[in-house]
Amino acid sequence: MDSKESLSPPGREEVPSSVLRPAERGNVMDLYKTLRGGAPVRVPASSPSLAPAAQPDSKQQRLAVDFPKGSASNAQQPDLSRAVSLSMGLYMGETETKVMGSDLAFPQQGQTSLSSGETDFRLLEESIASLNRSASGADNPRSTAPAAGSAAPTEGFPKTHSDLASERQNPKGQTGGSAGSAKLHPTDQSTFDILQDLEFSGSPSKDRSESPWRSDLLMDENCLLSPLAGEDDPFLLEGNSSEDCKPLILPDTKPKIKDNGDLILSNSNNVPLPQVKTEKEDFIELCTPGVIKQEKLGPVYCQASFSGANIIGNKISAISVHGVSTSGGQMYHYDMNAQQQEQKPLFNVIPPIPVGSENWNRCQGSGDDNLTSLGTMNFPGRSVFSNGYSSPGMRPDVSSPPSNSTTAAGPPPKLCLVCSDEASGCHYGVLTCGSCKVFFKRAVKGQHNYLCAGRNDCIIDKIRRKNCPACRYRKCLQAGMNLEARKTKKKIKGIQQTSTGVSQETSENPSNRTVVPAALPQLTPTLVSLLEVIEPEVLYAGYDSSVPDSTWRIMTTLNMLGGRQVIAAVKWAKAIPGFRNLHLDDQMTLLQYSWMFLMAFALGWRSYKQSSGNMLCFAPDLVINEQRMTLPYMYDQCKHMLFVSSELKRLQVSYEEYLCMKTLLLLSTVPKEGLKSQELFDEIRMTYIKELGKAIVKREGNSSQNWQRFYQLTKLLDSMHEVVENLLHYCFQTFLDKTMSIEFPEMLAEIITNQIPKYSNGNIKKLLFHQK
């Protein structure tokens, strides 16, 4: 059942009908006279254009005024346009806003816009002045007499001087009211009723004997501005659906409202004038579409939302402004319905404005933010609402710049695996540029011992590839560059050339096959090449040779240097392929057992290379010569260290052999109970034993001396256990003897403290190659 609302408040006196001017019965009054500034247009009641108004069941019934019999038939009736315009002031956001009917929407495609005179509200003051002259009869003393006519609502309302004075002060009506507090429409009615916003004390359904058109009520500033207080007695009208009370129907391309609230399209091309009709229930219901307030403050788009719902009867009317709903009920978007997406919009209130997104301010209210925004919905046959985004991907009305069709998208360029420059081809088995090709060739053939000034993690790219040759060479090896790959390529190319001469014979005789080398050199980087890259750099001791030497100063300096060398050894061990796969406890255990092995063997290698094993080269700035060896407590320890360098000199150990032997010394001592990842440890150790054999074969070639040399090198590895035992014994003694006052670095002191109980208890297991 359609709800109907009136303006008649109970408990107010009825305006006498004697003050109203008589008018002809059946005439239709133009309510837009004041808004348009023109004279009223009178249409006879028998006009064919009003024929549908007498049919209650018509789909396009117009709202007209039918005067009941015996109601001031000879009195001239005043114009009602001023009262309607004042009532419509609630929906006037600005002076440029159009108010009712088809004037409310912006001109759409194929629709001519209204003249500027229809939207000029400055004519309102002139209309008020003319109404003042026409309503001068209201000062007659007869206007105070009670009306003797029927109790039906009157067709006009007088004006007082106080009311006219208030209108001169506020000629625009109630345009300053907030549109946010207005309830736009219920769920069962698609039109908007502005009368339900008036806060009256009672429902008109209880008392209909008084006139709803009270001049003192219409002239009250607060009556149109006050929101619905949500009282227990809502404005409900008791009636049935067959009563002659239909909402305003909009023709043309605007959606029409059916009885059930659905929208339909009208084929009529006539623009009807909004009209008022006297109802049978002695009250007037004025229905009008909603009005959206358009701001004048530049390109500012304010998205409003509401936090309340108007409860009418047992249904909840959800308020939705700009697509934001405040309840879970049906949601309206003014011009569109979720069930009717194929029809044209009623309003196109916000045309696309080509401005940047930084000029748009969105005022988000307390609505449901999860619902679809009005600006994001797209329907066929309508222009999409612009949200002001300047990005072509966000705004559908902004076309993206045309793509250059002449530039063909070719394959991406191939990059060098070392410096990421554009690769020139496959060099030494790896896709590299010409610069890295030449660098790798010179680095390998020149046997340069590059040292990194940083932490062996320099960035190698096109710009910074020449800053650190050590890291660049390491990256070349990691990429898989190998000089043997070039030789293999030449061999394969020569074999292919020789096989082309006998290609026909090969095709005729399937038993023939292309000759392929039995064994190709390994193109991937070997373990020895990786060990070369991760080898720690030489450290300086910082020893002052200008000061006279002493055992205490030399020993303290050696301990400080040893602490830094231990840190470098930890980094080196973690970079060894396969070592980090061991359990973390096993890694720490191996480092604690082998730190003296690594330092002593590296010292022997430096002494062998730099002084042919005659002096101990701890650092470039600290070399222990024969004179320094004569100091107290120095000779016995230096004698054990010179043994290592002398053996390396005697065997003429190569650099590859030295690297493999040094790695095996890291894996030469374990606890008696074994390691947590013992199987993996045995596999890694066997791998580097084989690498030592490969290094021997590479040095000696396919000779019968390979096994003899392997025996000699492994015998040297076994002898390192005795050398390290003597060195550790002296180290533990100086660490425990506080009278010597020899300083130890923190990390080295921690390792010694943890290692002393294990050696004293004999909880060590030596991994020897030969039985004694």
UniProtKB/Swiss-Prot annotation:
The keyword ATP-binding does not apply. Heteromultimeric cytoplasmic complex with HSP90AA1, HSPA1A/HSPA1B, and FKBP5 or another immunophilin such as PPID, STIP1, or the immunophilin homolog PPP5C. Upon ligand binding FKBP5 dissociates from the complex and FKBP4 takes its place, thereby linking the complex to dynein and mediating transport to the nucleus, where the complex dissociates. Probably forms a complex composed of chaperones HSP90 and HSP70, co-chaperones CDC37, PPP5C, TSC1 and client protein TSC2, CDK4, AKT, RAF1 and NR3C1; this complex does not contain co-chaperones STIP1/HOP and PTGES3/p23. Directly interacts with UNC45A. The keyword Transmembrane does not apply. There is a cross-link at residues 258, 277, 293 (Glycyl lysine isopeptide (Lys-Gly) (interchain with G-Cter in SUMO2)). Receptor for glucocorticoids (GC). Has a dual mode of action: as a transcription factor that binds to glucocorticoid response elements (GRE), both for nuclear and mitochondrial DNA, and as a modulator of other transcription factors. Affects inflammatory responses, cellular proliferation and differentiation in target tissues. Involved in chromatin remodeling. Plays a role in rapid mRNA degradation by binding to the 5' UTR of target mRNAs and interacting with PNRC2 in a ligand-dependent manner which recruits the RNA helicase UPF1 and the mRNA-decapping enzyme DCP1A, leading to RNA decay. There is a cross-link at residues 277, 293, 698 (Glycyl lysine isopeptide (Lys-Gly) (interchain with G-Cter in SUMO)). Residues 1-22, 39-82, 132-186, 494-513 are annotated as: Disordered. Residues 416-481 bind DNA. It is found in: Cytoplasm; Nucleus; Mitochondrion; Cytoplasm, Cytoskeleton, Spindle. There is a cross-link at residue 414 (Glycyl lysine isopeptide (Lys-Gly) (interchain with G-Cter in ubiquitin)). The gene is NR3C1. This is Glucocorticoid receptor. Residues 44-58, 143-156 have a biased composition (Low complexity).
